[in-house]
């Protein structure tokens, strides 16, 4: 160990080396593979991966209970935490690459288990979503002579929403790609506003990838929750407030911030369709010990984007505008993907036809 390293740095290096040994070749290879999304160890010792274009599969590799327990202990040590049978749940980030890790020990499982969700190595932009058929956005023949050729449909609607500072709620089920889509919207935000706006991101685990130059990333701790961070963000002179996954009482603070001079936000929520996403927000708002607040929700949320996971991949199936709330429920306008978002350049071209 080089003498110039402090004792703390030496400990960090040793923990990193120990972590790599205990992860083993199979896990390290999976983490290095850009096609792999998640790496999972079941209590029976089988190692599974979720791979783009393939789905879930057994790697054929096995990890013993003793090795898995040692691994989780080392991960906990890198996080300044201890995982024991009395504290059998570990959640945090793998400090090798920022991947999210959740580990379990008996008695909550029969034998040690974990799931590692890899940090996004690349950010998919909206053009990538269109190219892969996840997002509707085709070039109309009458507009093909414009350079660059504009797209119509949902892609154009999302770009317009980003430019005009609409609040966007990304809705989807487990593993539907909500965070990846939020990162795609953040990428579009970077290309649209550059350094002209200050963006604050708030999340429990660092998964959002924001490349806006004027950006502050906030993350919860055991003593600072999401609600506290949203309120703190308001004192940091934000132009836009982006919330990773809304899962609790922070929904109320977020909606109020979007509604009081900080439009252009993005957030994700777990639900199966646009209307269910708003109802889910109602449920989360009530965790702040207030009534459901449908009027506030309808005023704060401008656009809902629904992404689903299908047997063949991800697909954005629905985009809807929120026009208000009534006694019978929310007033939503599903957006037809054949609609063209007319930029001034497109408008001049169409007039000339």
Give each language-model segment a name.
Residues 41-43, 51, 94, 105-107, ...:
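Flexible glycine-/small-residue-rich
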Residues 17, 29, 66-77, 156, ...:
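Solvent-exposed alpha-helical segments within well-ordered globular domains of core cellular machineries
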Residues 1-96:
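N-terminal accessory targeting/assembly segments
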Residues 56-73, 77-164:
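P-loop NTP-binding catalytic core
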Residues 49-63, 116, 314-325:
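Short, surface-exposed polybasic-and-hydrophobic patches located at secondary-structure transitions
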Residues 155, 165-173, 180, 184-300, ...:
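Switch/coupling sub-region of P-loop NTPases
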Residues 8-20, 297, 311-353:
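NTP-binding/hydrolysis catalytic cores, primarily Walker-type P-loop NTPases
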Residues 39, 103, 262, 301:
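Residue-level signature of catalytic and energy-coupling elements of molecular machines
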